[in-house]
Amino acid sequence: MENKIKITAGPYVFAARLETELAPQTCAAFLARLPFKSQIVHVRWSGEGVWIPLGDYEFGVGYENHTSYPSPGQFILYPGGISETEILLAYGGVHFASKMGQLAGNHFLTIVDGLENLMALGKMTLWKGAQDIVFEL
């Protein structure tokens, strides 16, 4: 299984490590969908994060390596259920939640290069709106 992912978000490029040992099913499901193209918007309930709302999209995974408190640079996948399916990236303090209350998502991907641009991406998304994002090998 490939362990590194290139992420282009807005004008920034990041390198990220798949957490294959901690979230093998989530990583495999995500890899099968690469290249993955979407847009990020700023979170509404969770703090300093951006997210990809995915509605009823199914990755076919349950919970593994799940958390409500991702650290900056960590991506989590919420597989759906109480709220819609989503991918969230923390750029600052996050307490993952929706209007239904606290949620937990699978930490499956961690930025390892480009962290110095993470806060700028978050603030750009907050003040300028949706940004394109592409995940690829």
Identify the function of each model-found stretch.
Residues 1-22:
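N-terminal intrinsically disordered, low-complexity, charge/repeat-rich segments that act as generic
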